[in-house]
Amino acid sequence: GILTTLPQRNLRGAALSNTVDSHVWLDPNNAVRIAFFIATLRSQQYPENKAKYMANAKEFSQQMLQVSQQYESSNKAKPYWSYHDAYQYLERALNLKFAGALTDDPHIAPTAAQIKYLMDNRPKAQMCLLAETSASSSQYRKLNPVVFQPVDESMRGEDNFVTAWKKLASKTDKCVLSTQN
């Protein structure tokens, strides 16, 4: 395929065979490939606009790669938790290491067993928890100390992908860095 895909993972981070994590747009390289795919498709539909479509895709790719490269680091990968596992396509760009999720479905509350697993296997004393804004503090306060970072992997309400990706990456990076002491 034209996209780099990763398998879905269980709550503890193990890959699930024969699955695909559908959050592919969060990988900067995938975002660029999607832009060129759209430009190529639209160029076939409207050949008179081909130069404009390709120029737009090229400009997008330059902006996206410039924004994403500012996070690259040779330091040890930084652990984080998520409410549900939606951010693995950000991990390479931000040098993150998934340390577990509370639930595999954002609409289902975490189990006591999963909270205990996270507590017993926490890689840092204080952890960053990436979660939907709808997540209730009662669902994660047992994990304290945590830095709760509300995020929306769908980028709902945004009208510029590069800006939206940068906001998501910046929030994520700040949260994870704040727990590295």
Question: Predicted regions: what is each one?
Answer:
Residues 1-181:
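Extracytoplasmic metal-acquisition and chelation regions
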